[in-house]
Amino acid sequence: MLKLLKQISTTSTFKKPSSINNGFININLFKNYCTSVKQEDKKKVLITTPIFYVNGPPHIGHLYSALLGDALGRWNRFIGNDTLFMTGTDEHGSKVDEAAKKNGLKTIDYCDKISNRFRELFDKADIKYDDFIRTTEPRHKEAVTAIWNRLLERGYIYKGVYKGWYCTSDESFLTDDQVTEGMSPITPQNPISKKCMISLESGHEVNWIEEENYMFKLSEFSKTIENWFEEVKPIFPAIHVNLLRYMLSQGIKDLSISRPSSRIPWGIEVPNDPSQTIYVWLDALTNYLTVTGYPNVSPNSSQSHWSNATHIIGKDIIKFHSVYWPSFLIAADYPLPKSIICHAHWTVNREKMSKSRGNVVDPFLAIDNHGLELIRYFLLKGGGLENDGDWSEHELAVRFKSDLADTYGNLISRCTGKALNPSGEWPKSVTDTSLFTMDDQKLIENSSILVKSVSTHYDRGDFKSGIFEIMTFLYECNLYVQNQAPWKLVPKPNRVGSDLIRLNTIIYIAIEMIRITSLLLSPIIPTSSNLTLNYLSIPLENRSNPSNFKFGYNYHQNQNNLKLPKEILILFHKK
């Protein structure tokens, strides 16, 4: 098992490049360092979001999960990986059946309606998924049947009687240590709270049940899973491992992986036993194999994207993805995921989002009211992997004005306007490095450090930290232009001391910073980034591959297009 664990790579750390020495740079070494993202053979990568439960319409938290996956997918395509990014909907279980009845629809018709709503949201939000899986699809039933049979054949499934606590809302069994006396939560369906046993994990009501189920030998994998946590460190951020360590230290019992079909009819039946329905979590988790072509393509095959899988999940489902799922995979003799990126939740003005409070944020309305690019930016910068993000209309306005309009947008309009460039021509490449001042060198050096640091953040799905560093650097770029005062160098009648060479150098460096940061922002705000790169006449072939982070792009390579566009690019119109 440890051999398997060590095969999963860990993220490398950033070291200050040897080309930097006391604020000056060896320009030749620096040019090599600018291709700072490691060039490797193209590899298959699988990126997954949770599949979203269709017992209700999508909310802003669902969109956040999908955006994390989308940004990670875009980044992996940028660096040249053969990327399969999937999302989808989880459509089985009692809660879905109940929701369909409340809406007066057949269960499959209800699933179609809500699943389509998720797809509409992701299309509206420019989520570039490669596969949208539904657990009601025939291909998924085939995959679930296959993994059930494999676990059965390998001796990890047996029939037994389960006695214990069951939470219908969470569709999860709980031990005595995971429940306590409490009050049932108030919901539209149950407006009066009552004394009952509740889950310590979710606060939802639990009931004692005794029934015959198929059981999975989960207890056999406790030590192996613990070793996986310690040896491979697959869960990011590591803070989320603490709860799992505690859970394992308390001991884990065998897991019921079926329900009587008389109680849970809406699901995939156990092979050769129609009296039982497969547990919704074994069903749902298997979707990650379904999208790779399983069972027709083995997860052990080098041709499968499963060989390098990253799951993006919310903290509320970490137990299922980090204990149950790897145990199923080990039992089936399939590789484990490379990493599990676990994110926190969203509050609204520091309050928990809930229907009873009436503060659930509709993502469709949010995009309509604020525009897609701002919503993408706000969620990816404001959301948290460790701590909950907070939805605030005030913060939306602040982020728009401070970051997008005043910092990124201002640098673009400032450096391409006629005030600094009355000739309206692209600046010439600066090949004579003796023309660089210490301030020039420092900014170029910092752009290289930025690329390396942001790449490290992006590789592990920490877009919040990456965006923070980009915006800090863009603020530095604006300060650089302010301090260099290029407007004093623009030739004008009766002006003495104009210096066209120095003016060209300042504008060239500033525009290069715009190009490099636009590439870095392309997974976050793809439309705005592409509009900027279009404006700079950057060909499509120069908008991917880490080599394009290299400082020194020749804007004069197209001799037929030496002029800047006549109209200044204004990406973000202030309201």
Swiss-Prot record:
GO molecular function per UniProt: ATP binding; methionine-tRNA ligase activity
InterPro entries the UniProt entry points to: Anticodon_Met, Met-tRNA_synth, Met-tRNA_synth_2, Methionyl/Leucyl_tRNA_Synth, MetRS_core, Rossmann-like_a/b/a_fold, tRNAsynth_Ia_anticodon-bd
Binding locations of ATP: K355
A Pfam family recorded for this sequence: Anticodon_3
Biological processes annotated in GO: methionyl-tRNA aminoacylation
Catalysed reaction, written as an equation: tRNA(Met) + L-methionine + ATP = L-methionyl-tRNA(Met) + AMP + diphosphate
Ranges in coiled-coil conformation: none
EC numbers on record: 6.1.1.10
Subcellular location: Mitochondrion matrix
Span(s) of short sequence motif 'KMSKS' region: 352-356
Family: Belongs to the class-I aminoacyl-tRNA synthetase family.
PANTHER family: METHIONINE--TRNA LIGASE, MITOCHONDRIAL, METHIONYL-TRNA SYNTHETASE
Protein name: Probable methionine--tRNA ligase, mitochondrial
Organism whose genome encodes this protein: Dictyostelium discoideum
